[in-house]
UniProtKB/Swiss-Prot annotation:
This is Fe(3+)-Zn(2+) purple acid phosphatase. InterPro entries: Calcineurin-like_PHP_ApaH (IPR004843), Metallo-depent_PP-like (IPR029052), MPP_PAP (IPR041792), PPA-like (IPR039331), Purple_acid_Pase-like_N (IPR008963), Purple_acid_Pase_N (IPR015914), Purple_acid_PPase_C_dom (IPR025733). Inhibited by compounds CC24201, CC27209, and MO07123. Inhibited by the tetraoxoanions molybdate and phosphate. Not inhibited by EDTA or tartrate. It is found in: Secreted. It comes from the Eukaryota. It comes from Phaseolus vulgaris. Glycans are attached at N108, N136, N170, N238, N423.
Length: 459
């Protein structure tokens, strides 16, 4: 009872100090870079020294609840070993996990040897070290497992989308790394390398992107969402397997949530239940994704994971002209479920800019009533578009005018977000513009949990 009173007291205090920029289109003018893509000889693309040294090391959650980690890397000269040696900071006894190796071809490109190994039965809230490679080219990294799932478990997620490998991309990643909020896991909302923008989908750019992001993703998990630039369906060069490079390189624990595809799945982490959806896989009635999501939402236990977060690539609400209403078909299928199950927030990318919505829904339409305008709905999620991480150096600045009522704040700049869960009732979201100091919040808002504290948090 004392804990509940304390939470309510905190809720009352935070209710008074909500800070945000509601109903605003920012007039901030960003500086432009003359050169957009970082050249292949950039230091961030540097190949680690040594024969067959592991590179492009990255990790992601390897099970449903955070007690496993998928370790992935590439060796270029020969297969080497897919074994991972790991140990906890508290106990130096090394264990070994064995994985699998694969390769692929794409047009005239042959991949290196891609390794995926899952380490299991990890302890919660523990620092682990791990090593990959053999003999003189062994490389060592570390990560911290999440706390056990629970009602009032604090945890901080970073939000990055449409990263690419431009100079702006590098600024975004540096800002995230230097943030005083210290994100613990990245929720990545799609469009990774943009290799498909280069001649013949030059897959060398998958390798450079893997080396570029290693400085973060080798040390904390990134939760992957597939975007349109991962599709790489290119019949003109006889490449007709959708998502081929992405699927070989980036594994996710989709089977742990009874999904039949790596493009939609869920995980639990700390106090959040995170659902990843695919904007570019079938989602109509009766499709595998539709059927899975219907069952998945029923399984969410807000008494265990109070925060319900959805990730997708194409936004359902967007007031920029670019990609305007592209998410409409998915919205008509899933929005009513988001309202019914009181999803707290939906993060998307695709649009190369930032936008935060009010809590709105557009689910009242019937052919007899003509109601087709979004209305305020405190059971609905906030929709945040954060596809502004840098891509290939192009920002989407052409906005729908006048600003729709559902749009609370929007700005055509590059940046990243932070979703900082405090307890079962409150979380703080901030968006950080690249051209500000790392501690400056260009937009911020307190979230009140839709299940535990469903008061009006409009801005």
């Amino acid at each position: 009872m004392g804990v509940v009173k304390g939470l309510l007291a905190l809720a009352l205090v935070l209710n008074v100090v909500v800070v945000s920029n509601g109903g605003k289109s920012s007039n901030f003018v960003r500086k432009t870079n003359k050169n957009r893509d970082m050249p292949l000889d950039s230091d961030v693309f540097r190949v680690p020294p040594g024969y067959n040294a592991p590179q492009q090391v990255h990790i992601t959650q390897g099970d449903l609840v955070g007690r496993a980690m998928i370790i992935s890397w590439v060796t270029m000269d020969e297969p080497g070993s897919s074994a991972v040696r790991y140990w906890s900071e508290k106990n130096g006894r090394k264990r070994i996990a064995k994985g699998k190796m694969s390769t692929y071809r794409f047009f005239n490109y042959s991949s290196g040897f891609i390794h995926h190994t899952t380490i299991r039965k990890l302890k919660y809230n523990t620092k682990y070290y791990y090593e990959v490679g053999l003999r003189n080219t062994t490389r060592r990294f570390s990560f911290i497992t999440p706390p056990q799932t629970g009602l009032d478990v604090p945890y901080t997620f970073g939000l990055i989308g449409d990263l690419g490998q431009s100079f702006d991309s590098n600024t975004t990643l540096s800002h995230y790394e230097l943030s005083p909020k210290k994100g613990q896991t990245v929720l990545f909302v799609g469009d990774l390398s943009y290799a498909d923008r280069y001649p013949n989908h030059d897959n060398v750019r998958w390798d450079t992107w893997g080396r570029f992001t290693e400085r973060s993703v080798a040390y904390q998990p990134w939760i992957w969402t597939a975007g349109n630039h991962e599709i790489e369906f290119a019949p003109e060069i006889n490449e007709t397997e959708p998502f081929k490079p992405f699927s070989y390189r980036y594994h996710v624990p989709y089977e742990a949530s009874q999904s039949t595809s790596p493009f939609w799945y869920s995980i639990k982490r700390a106090s959040a239940h995170i659902i990843v959806l695919s904007s570019y896989s079938a989602y109509g009635r009766g499709t595998p994704q539709y059927t899975w999501l219907k069952k998945e939402l029923r399984k969410v236990k807000r008494s265990e994971t109070p925060w319900l977060i959805v990730l997708m690539h194409s936004p359902l609400y967007n007031s920029y002209n670019h990609h305007f209403m592209e998410g409409e078909a998915m919205r008509t299928k899933f929005e009513a479920w988001f309202v019914k199950y009181k999803v707290d927030v939906v993060f998307a990318g695709h649009v190369h800019a930032y936008e935060r919505s009010e809590r709105v829904s557009n689910i009242a339409y019937k052919i007899t009533n003509g109601l087709c305008t979004p209305v305020k709905d405190q059971s609905a999620p906030v929709y945040i578009t954060i596809g502004d991480a840098g891509n290939y150096g192009v920002i989407d600045s052409n906005m729908i005018q006048p600003q729709p009522e559902y749009s609370a704040f929007r700005e055509a700049s590059f940046g990243h977000g932070m979703f900082d869960i405090k307890n079962r009732t409150h979380a703080h979201f901030s968006w950080n513009r690249n051209q500000d100091g790392v501690a400056v919040e260009a937009d911020s808002v307190w979230f009140f949990n839709r299940h535990w504290y469903p008061v009006d948090d409009s801005t």
